[in-house]
């Protein structure tokens, strides 16, 4: 059996020798040195690591320099035994290891007989002395004990330096949020299959909190085995069974009776939320075969605040009288419920509307010690989230219906001379998103007049799988890893949008004279696929006992996307004004993506470490959900076409219409040529990163680190709008073409930061962490990402849009704590009922404070991303928190409109030129623990989110055309109370 497995590993490694690295690290590594009492090295010492919870054993032998490396150690608590002739046996117990950790340890031996033994308790280092990477660990204690809304563990990621969590993605060190890598047990767990996100939908983010052992975040100068990613990796490690049965039952509940009133509502909105489930793990065969399973479900019935501009009663009556066909569209809107000026087109509507969210989720994992040197792990996860989200239009809610399946098989082989890890990952998703106005068949009116209501049906499904191999060897002072990966993505998609009409003025609407019409016929069902190939090598070189060098190189090849039936067409020529390309080669492949990594860790003293380095990190473009999905997939039938005012008149298109009615006009080249275009030169996005930090161990349990972190991201997406109508005449430069999007990889993002981290691990009843970051991020688009960014205001002057990125937060502070209240000790340790009453109390919390994000002032025209002029004076108004009017309308002026509804020139105000208000919040939790015997524990806890009920305004209306321009329309939530009961053993 062992011989077969060993030969299989070697064959697999040979097969994959040209593939990329394992993107994420599930295991820990120990770099050890064995010495005698004088400090001289001890050669040929036998080293054994035993997992205290499962009985798993790893063996190696120190070399002539007394050096050894233990690799691929699953997270857990270990006993390390060192034996050498002429010395007493050294036994180090209680060494806690986490995923991705690389620890340097010394094992000094005492002279004596092997029959004698010296036992010590391990002190896991609190500072990193082995590598330059930035680590943020969310361990079991923080996951279980800190307050998390709806048991959402992803909110704890922002407790790390340089991490900003937004819209289910993570911006690491200012880099594009879809440039990170999200994995569970090392295998891809991206929810949508289109971009890296922390979830496809719902509260359960890829895996239940109950199943999580720890979450490891690696960024900065990560080793070459981390990739492909341009910013970093979030890896969730799930729990496994042990030799003891352990499990839990929990109930999480929220009701409106204990919640504060939303600041924009007159009464508390009804709310019923229940989250429930449990776990069970243990041995099937002691020391050999283990299992762990989790079920979690939630049912949410709540009222969400919906707000926006809606047509006034007088305006809609006037339009319907002139154009009766608009009655169905205006009937989808409620009437304003706030005061508005006589003759106004729109008024403001705000109310509470019913929302619904359900999910059922389960996860099963088994771990099998095949032999003393071979470990096999298998995990499977599935969930069925559903979501109903209300919007301003009661007739147009959005629903999601999703099915997700994820699995991973992991195999570890270890020996004295080499070790290896093999992983197979699988991810299958099905998603249907429906805007209900689509079902009504109503043509939409969007844009300039201050109100919009449109709808789409999107069906999306796909699969991605990967196979990875990593081999580790120890050669003197060199610990070498090399590995490979093959990962294939496939995605099918079908989507269609209702016709969208834009009218520049009220007079145009009354005359049914559309300024612009966008028809999205939808993409015929298709299957896109691409793959990643490459390899890496990593050498951790112990130059001296005080200096470690991390030398790495990885190569990545990202294939050009293809369509299963060769139905993918791109155009060539200057900015896409040319013939179609080969469907199997929509842009030029790049074969030279080499990414060097260089890091160092220098222990100036045993308690002071200087770390730093430089590296290149490469990602794939977000093809699915990005530009590729919009590329025309039929030569005779576009998926989207945009008609100018003159073109609409030429073809006789007026409100309303249907996609089916317009299709004959453009099918077979009968109308303007449409379709999105991707530049032939479309290199992969990458970042250049550099760091320098100083870390100090304050006590055995406390540390402080201060770091400078910088990076420069290159080749993220920019989209230009090509063949727009002339700003004055309203004519297109190339009349035979429609307006279309042109994607090129020319975005640049720069980030500089000073990051400071304080950590105190749990000791004497107290755990604490604090992070302060000063940072500045600059980009050229208002959605700097790898998928669908916003176009620049001026297509031919993208550099004029240089400004703060949308996730530029200048000052950011977080602190978290867990404190076991010493009430029983202060009361003299009472017995019986007194101990039951006073013992087991704890308090925990998270304090967040940050300055406001950038906000972008816009003007609605046929030129997307248009901005108005700044005409002087303060853009902000005083007493905004009392009046709710934050921006000063008189400081801005609309740019006059020319031909075809286009502004006659770009507006003068810069992109993201203004700032929103800052944010601060304190979440608290108070818990009482009841202990029954040695193993059973019941925790009853109350979580208070926004415990002080501080109003943090958000939702600023930034469109100059809006009647509510500059007003706050929402908050980031009033106080909520969540009750949780959890029984564990």
Feature map (PLM): residue ranges:
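Short, solvent-exposed micro-motifs at the edges of structured domains
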Residues: 272, 560, 660-661, 671-690, ...
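Transmembrane beta-barrel strands of outer-membrane/channel proteins
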Residues: 122, 249-255, 293-297, 378-382, ...
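Residue-level signature of outer-membrane beta-barrel architecture
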Residues: 219, 238, 282-284, 368, ...
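Periplasmic N-terminal accessory/gating domains of Gram-negative outer-membrane beta-barrel systems
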Residues: 63, 81, 88-240, 246, ...
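Periplasm-facing N-terminal accessory domains of Gram-negative outer-membrane beta-barrel systems
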Residues: 2-6, 11-139, 208-210
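Solvent-exposed loop/turn elements at secondary-structure boundaries
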Residues: 166, 441-444, 563-595, 600-744, ...
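Hydrophobic, lipid-facing positions within transmembrane beta-strands of outer-membrane proteins
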Residues: 168, 230-232, 274-278, 360-364, ...
């Amino acid at each position: 059996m062992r011989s077969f497995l060993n030969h299989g590993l070697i064959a697999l490694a040979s097969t994959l020798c040209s593939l990329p690295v394992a993107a994420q690290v599930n295991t820990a590594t120990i770099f050890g040195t064995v010495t005698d009492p004088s400090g001289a090295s001890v050669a040929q010492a036998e080293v054994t690591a035993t997992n205290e919870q499962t009985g798993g054993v790893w063996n190696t032998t120190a070399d002539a320099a007394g050096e050894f490396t233990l690799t691929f150690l699953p997270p857990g608590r270990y006993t390390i035994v060192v034996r050498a002739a002429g010395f007493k046996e050294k036994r180090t117990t209680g060494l806690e290891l986490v995923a991705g950790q690389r620890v340097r340890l010394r094992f000094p031996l005492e002279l004596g007989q092997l029959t004698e033994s010296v036992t010590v308790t391990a002190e896991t280092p609190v500072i990193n002395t082995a590598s330059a990477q930035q680590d943020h660990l969310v361990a079991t204690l923080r996951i279980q004990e800190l307050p998390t809304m709806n048991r959402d563990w992803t909110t704890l990621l922002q407790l790390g330096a340089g991490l900003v969590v937004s819209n289910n993605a993570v911006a690491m060190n200012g880099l594009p949020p879809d440039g990170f890598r999200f994995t569970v047990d090392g295998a891809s767990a991206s929810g949508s299959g289109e971009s890296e996100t922390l979830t496809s939908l719902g509260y359960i983010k890829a895996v239940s909190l109950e199943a999580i052992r720890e979450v490891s975040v690696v960024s900065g100068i990560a080793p070459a085995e981390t990739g492909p990613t341009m910013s970093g990796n979030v890896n969730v490690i799930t729990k496994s069974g042990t030799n003891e049965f352990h499990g839990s039952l929990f109930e999480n509940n929220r009701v409106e009776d204990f919640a504060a009133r939303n600041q924009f509502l007159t009464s508390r909105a009804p709310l019923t939320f229940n989250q429930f489930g449990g776990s069970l793990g243990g041995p099937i065969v002691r020391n050999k075969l283990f299992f762990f399973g989790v079920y979690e479900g939630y049912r949410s019935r709540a009222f969400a605040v919906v707000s926006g501009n809606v047509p006034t009663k007088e305006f809609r009556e006037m339009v319907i009288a002139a154009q009766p066909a608009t009655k169905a569209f205006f009937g989808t809107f409620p009437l304003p419920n706030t005061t508005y000026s006589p003759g106004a087109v729109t008024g403001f509507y705000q109310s509470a509307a019913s929302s619904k969210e359900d999910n059922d989720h389960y996860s099963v994992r088994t771990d099998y010690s095949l032999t003393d040197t071979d470990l096999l792990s298998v995990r499977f996860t599935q969930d069925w989230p559903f979501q109903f989200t209300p919007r301003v239009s009661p007739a147009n809610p959005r629903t999601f219906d999703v099915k997700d399946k994820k699995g991973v098989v992991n195999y570890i082989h270890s020996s004295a001379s080499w070790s290896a890890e093999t992983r197979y990952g699988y991810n299958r998703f099905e998603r249907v998103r429906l805007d209900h106005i689509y079902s009504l068949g109503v043509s939409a009116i969007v844009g300039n007049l201050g109100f919009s209501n449109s709808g789409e049906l999107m069906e999306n499904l796909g699969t991605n799988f990967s196979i990875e191999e990593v081999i580790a060897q120890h050669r003197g002072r060199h610990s070498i890893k090399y590995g490979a990966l093959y990962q294939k993505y496939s995605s099918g998609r079908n989507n269609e949008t209702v016709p969208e009409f834009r009218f520049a003025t009220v007079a145009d609407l009354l005359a049914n004279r559309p300024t612009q019409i966008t028809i999205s016929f939808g993409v015929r069902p298709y299957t896109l696929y691409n793959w990643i190939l490459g390899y890496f090598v990593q050498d951790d070189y112990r130059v001296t006992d005080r200096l470690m060098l991390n030398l790495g190189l990885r190569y990545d090849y990202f294939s050009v996307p293809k369509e299963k039936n060769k139905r993918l067409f791109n155009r060539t020529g200057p900015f896409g004004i040319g013939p179609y390309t080969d469907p199997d080669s929509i842009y030029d492949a790049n074969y030279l993506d080499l990414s060097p990594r260089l890091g160092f860790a220098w222990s100036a003293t045993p308690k002071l470490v200087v770390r730093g380095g430089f590296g290149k990190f490469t990602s794939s473009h977000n093809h699915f959900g990005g530009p590729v999905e919009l590329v025309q997939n039929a030569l005779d039938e576009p998926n989207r076409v945009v008609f100018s005012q003159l073109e609409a008149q030429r073809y006789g298109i007026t409100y309303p219409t249907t996609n089916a009615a317009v299709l004959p006009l453009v099918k077979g080249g009968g109308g303007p040529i449409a379709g999105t275009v991707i530049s032939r030169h479309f290199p992969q996005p990458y970042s250049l990163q550099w760091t320098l930090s100083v870390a100090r161990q304050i006590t055995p349990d406390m540390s402080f680190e201060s770091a400078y972190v910088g990076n420069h991201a290159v080749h993220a997406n920019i989209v230009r709008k090509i063949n727009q109508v002339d700003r004055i005449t309203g004519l297109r430069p190339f009349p035979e073409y429609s307006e279309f999007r042109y994607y090129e990889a020319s975005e640049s993002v720069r980030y500089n930061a000073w990051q400071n981290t304080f950590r105190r691990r749990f000791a004497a009843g107290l755990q604490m962490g604090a992070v302060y970051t000063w940072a500045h991020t600059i980009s050229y688009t208002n959605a700097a990402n790898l998928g669908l960014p916003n176009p620049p205001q001026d297509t031919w002057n993208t550099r004029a849009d240089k400004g703060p990125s949308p996730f530029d937060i200048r000052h950011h502070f977080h602190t978290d704590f867990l404190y076991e209240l010493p009430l029983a000790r202060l009361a003299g340790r009472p017995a019986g009922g007194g101990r039951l009453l006073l013992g087991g109390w704890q308090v925990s919390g998270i304090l967040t404070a940050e300055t406001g994000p950038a906000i972008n002032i816009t003007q609605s025209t046929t030129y997307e991303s248009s901005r108005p002029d700044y005409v002087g004076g303060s853009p902000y108004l005083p007493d905004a928190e009392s009046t709710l009017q934050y921006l000063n309308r008189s400081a801005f002026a609309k740019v006059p409109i020319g031909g075809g509804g286009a502004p006659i020139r770009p507006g003068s105000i810069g992109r993201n030129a203004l700032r929103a208000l800052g944010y601060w919040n304190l979440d608290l939790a108070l818990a009482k623990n009841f202990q029954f015997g040695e193993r059973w524990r019941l925790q009853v806890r109350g979580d208070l989110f926004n415990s002080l009920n501080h109003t943090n305004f958000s939702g600023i209306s930034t469109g100059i055309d809006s009647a509510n321009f500059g007003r706050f329309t929402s908050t980031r939530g009033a106080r909520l109370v969540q009750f949780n009961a959890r029984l564990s053993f």
